[in-house]
Structure formats: C-alpha cells, structure tokens
Amino acid sequence: MFKDRENKRFIKIFKEGSLTESIQILLDTETGVNYIHLNAGYGISLTPLLDSDGKVVVSSEREIQNYIDRN
C-alpha cells in the first residue's frame, strides 16, 4: 500500500532486535522529529525520542536529506 510512494514521510534510520522484539528509530521527514518504535510480542509503542535533557530530538534539514539519500 505505502511501498509505492516515492516520498515517504517516515523513514527507518536505526533497527535492532530479533523476530519477536525490536527497537527502531523512525524519522518524520516533514517535521524532523525522531520517534522510538518498540515492538515486543503483541505490544507496540511509538513515542518521540528524547535527548538527555528531556527535549524531543529533531533532525536538521541536512540530516534529513542525508537519510533520504541513503534510502
């Protein structure tokens, strides 16, 4: 359904885990906000990624373009 879209709003910039448990960092290419996506069994969580000061991690336009170029 969404794989045919040329300009994806969310791109995966990190993934680690196994078949049943995983952690991913997703980047919203429109806002620059980074999200952490946890998947464990039947449970799923999606929340903004926070830095050490508790502020939302926002990628710069340059970082976003670098990630888009890699994918």
Label for each model-derived stretch:
Residues 2-23, 29-30, 37-71:
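Motif-centric detector for short Cys/His coordination patterns
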